[in-house]
Amino acid sequence: MGSMKELLFEMQEERRDEWIAENYPDAEEGTPEWDAAAQEYSWFQDWMDEAAEQQCFEASLTSIPDRLQDAKAELDELESLMQFNQPRIVERMAYVHCVSVLDSFLMYSARALLSHPPHLHRFLQHASSFVRKDEKRDLLNRKWIEQEPEVDTPEQAYVWRAQALVAKMTFQNHKTISRYFSTMLTTPHEWPLQEIEGLIKIRNALVHRNGVNESLEPIYISQGSVQIAISTVRNFISVAAETLLQEDALY
């Protein structure tokens, strides 16, 4: 193991020396100029590593399998948390987070599908159903107003615009979920929307009315309530993911 570390260290030093020789040919090892160049190389490498990490993260946001794995991991973590007695406030927060996991999975999946031209064109065609008039105007603008107003909008810019609009949407309403995906998906599907309707209502009461429902009755969240919510969301995501992955595979 030690020899392998030494080999990697030597390779890193060689790459550093090559970079310095190319960018600072007059710098000699042991001089302040060489030390400054070595420090700049180190900063450059750190920046490259961070950029690569960010690029991988952004790519994962447009991958439905990655988003499914992330959602399942979040629910597993919540389930582990609920194996032990928790303060009431933690149980309430865990319940709310179940809906957040559902919301984010649907949003990122919808966003990911927009990378496919046929799906993007469907979004552009039905934009009036999803966004405000001013947002639709900017979305469909034939000029690339974000970068070069005199240039025609490239295809990828339409993708970015549509994805930005979807990223602002919330899928915490069963009617919104039904309207969006019934319009956008070509794959036949029947999702258990009724199962999440009550869960979302309780979530909204916890978030917006401090645990009081529309009938002005208090809502009590228990360990069992959270476990049921986790199971409900997990089941819905599994059913939805099957459809979304089939849709993704069409393109």
Where are these regions (language model features)?
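Extended low-complexity intrinsically disordered regions
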Residues: E22-A51, V151-I177
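Polyanionic, low-complexity intrinsically disordered segments
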Residues: M1-M48, Q55-A59, W191-Y251
